[in-house]
Amino acid sequence: MEKLTAFVQEHIGDDLTRLILDRKKWPDIDMDLAVSCIQSRRKLKGKVQEWFSNPDLIFPVGLSAEQCSSSATGIYKSGLALRIADGRPFRLADLTGGLGVDSWYFSKKAKQVWYHEMQEKLCIAAEHNFQSLNAENIVVRNIISTPETIDGILSEARPDIVYMDPARRGEGGKKMFLIEECTPDVLTLKEQIFRHCRYILLKLSPMADITMACSRLGGKCREVHIVATGGECKELLIWMDREWAGEYTITAVELPSGYPDMDPASFSFCSSEEKIATASTRPRNDVSGFLFEPGKALMKAGCFNLIAERFDLMKLGVSTHYYVTESTAKADELKPYGKVYMILSAQPLDKRSIKATGAAYPRAEVTARNIPMDTETLRKKLGVTSGDDAHIFGLKSDTRGNLLLITRRY
């Protein structure tokens, strides 16, 4: 193992195809494993820095590093698990161990974690890696969770929480979005799981439809967490509670780059609140102040009227999910939840304004929403190249028609 570790560190930046072709130069090195470790380390750099920085860890499956949680989302999930356990010591069974990143983060909060994985080589690597990371409260088991095995798995682990991140790729790497298409199938297993423990924490594709997923899972969904970081929606987490009979809460979370030292921006609501919320699109003589573009988590949550209502914002249009405020204090409050722009000018979207704006701001970012052209078409009409002179928006206002807004990031 020491030779492999040294080889990986020495060749971390090398061309992997060349290493494979020249494998005969290093007869005492398992080149397939070495290449997989190098691939994985490249993916883990900046994603799970503590793992990348530990030279003793091995990674036999490159795809696992690509699919594993980041440090930020791993920390968030472990904190959520602790809240599910009401802050008390808890036991957790991870039925989809994979690379082991989630199990490792859970182990920092849990009394004991049981890692279950169907691929033997991942289990061998996980046991080695957990020891190298001094994670002494993780038990590794090489087993697949099926209706035939789940009772034995949970009888041994005796968990307070079961965690599942079902594999979302089918044959040929095809992405799967429906719950029943993923492995293991939580729809098949959930009733058996509930006979052994009260709580299930389920991670789904961030592309999954929340309403459909919760409907398929039955009335036991207690909370839905949409977790975004780095401008991308990364995870969709569903907390299921065997004893829950109420409406589920949706929490949209934006994790800042400084998380966990910096608090996340979170916005919680129930669907019934969004249904009765109203957003003002009242007529105005001008559009001025600040423009707010909700982050990916809020957009996924679909709480478009509640955003306007809770933050006291004017919504440009029923189907245009951009908001305006004249308050600097409000603009500062909104920053963690998305992007805020200072409005320099607003004018009708027509040939004259397009020509004048393109000439005045030749290097600008461009966004088109809810108007009869897409972003690329508007960019070509403006004749601008990408740059930071301004950010030009083509947006539809219910009261003023199609607008051309010239803004700068606030």
Feature locations, PLM:
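SAM-dependent transferase fold signal centered on methyltransferase-like domains
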Residues: M1-Y410
